[in-house]
Structures are given as C-alpha cells and as structure tokens.
C-alpha cells in the first residue's frame, strides 16, 4: 500500500503564498480531496480565511460540513431534475447550486424559487453551460443569483476570459460577479482589474498539488 508523505510546513507555505498571490480564490475540494481528504482541506481553508468552498457533487456537502465547514459551499456539478440529494439542498442559503441549462431554470423555480445559484455559461470546452446566445435573455427573477461561472479549458487564454465576460455582461444581472477557472494568477488579476464586476477564481490542482516537490510516495 502506497502512502503520500508530505512536508507539511513547506506545503502550508505554498498554500499561503498561493492564496496571497490570487486573492478571492474558491478552493475546490471535490472527490477524495485530491488525496488529502476533506478534513485536512477544510482545516487548511479555514486557516487561509477562505469564505467559500467548492465541492464536486451534492453528496460532498455533508462531508465538508462534517469536518466543521459552516460557510458557503458551491456544488460544481450542474443541477438536474431527479437528483434527490441536490434537491434537498436547494433551500439551504449556504449551498450554491450550479445551473447550466435554460430548461432547468424553469424546473428549479417550481421547487425553490429563491435558491442560491450560479449560472454556468458554455465555453470552448462545450461540456456544460448555457449557450452564449441565450445568456442575455435568461429570466432569473427571484433567485439569489451569486454570479456567473465560466469553466475555461486548462491553460485558458486571457482572450477567452475577456470574451466570456463580454457575453455575461449582456445580462442585466452581470454585476453579481463572474467566477473563472484555469486562468493563470496573472491573467486572473489582470482581468479582475479590467472588469467592473466582482471576480473569483476556482482552483483545485494548482492549490493543493502545486507543490509536488514537497510530497513523495512511500510503500
């Protein structure tokens, strides 16, 4: 059985430096917590003064809360009708639900008309998201809209980030903020200075596993 051995102090120094260099990050704690487990990642997020965690699926909300996380949690996997666990969290004001299809907005309004949501916009990844030509006309009245989420491909360019922001800003509620992923810290900061809306960045691998020289495997 392999064990992951960590130089804890150097790893924590990396986390602190990363958080300072990219203010406003939203750490991702999905799955098994990048091999560290949810308990440790919750503890480190609290130490860093983080205000929002991201989990992959609705079932993981209970796990981070079990270890003491009592602030906001965003569920990255887009909501779909029929997910009973996700439906049970819709009226929790500290759980932010991701919406990625126009038809799901209508379905969600029937279940939880004041739910806290992020709206995902389709990018060049073409994985999830509301198509660009549908964004401006989305009816989000009544929801607690926390912002718009832009899942860019790995190594995304600043140009695509700018273009996605332009699309979002066509909506009357664009001022709620834009959440990006996979921008470099420099590009993220540059974009946040250019936009007149709040900007956040989700980050997982680069935060938790970015200091690979401080870890090794032992049998």
Locate predicted features.
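Alpha-helical packing segments of well-folded alpha/beta enzyme cores
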Residues: 11-14, 18
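Catalytic alpha/beta core domains of metabolic enzymes, predominantly
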Residues: 152-214
């Amino acid at each position: 059985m392999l064990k992951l051995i960590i130089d804890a102090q150097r790893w924590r120094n990396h986390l602190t430096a990363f958080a300072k260099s990219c203010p406003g990050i939203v750490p991702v704690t999905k799955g098994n917590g990048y091999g560290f487990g949810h308990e440790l990642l919750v503890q480190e997020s609290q130490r860093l003064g983080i205000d929002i965690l991201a989990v992959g699926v609705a079932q993981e909300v209970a796990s981070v809360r079990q270890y003491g996380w009592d602030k906001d949690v965003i569920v990255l996997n887009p909501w779909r009708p029929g997910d009973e666990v996700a439906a049970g969290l819709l009226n929790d004001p500290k759980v932010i639900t991701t919406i990625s299809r126009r038809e799901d907005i209508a379905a969600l309004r029937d279940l939880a008309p004041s739910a806290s949501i992020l709206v995902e916009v389709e990018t060049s990844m073409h994985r999830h998201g509301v198509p660009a030509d549908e964004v401006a006309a989305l009816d989000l009245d009544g929801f607690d809209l926390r912002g718009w989420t832009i899942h860019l491909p790995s190594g995304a360019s600043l140009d695509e980030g700018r273009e996605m922001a332009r699309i979002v800003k066509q909506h009357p509620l664009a001022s709620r903020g834009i959440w990006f992923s996979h921008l470099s810290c420099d590009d993220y900061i540059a974009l946040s200075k250019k936009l007149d809306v709040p900007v956040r960045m989700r980050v997982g691998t680069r935060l938790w596993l970015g200091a690979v020289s401080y870890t090794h495997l032992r049998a």
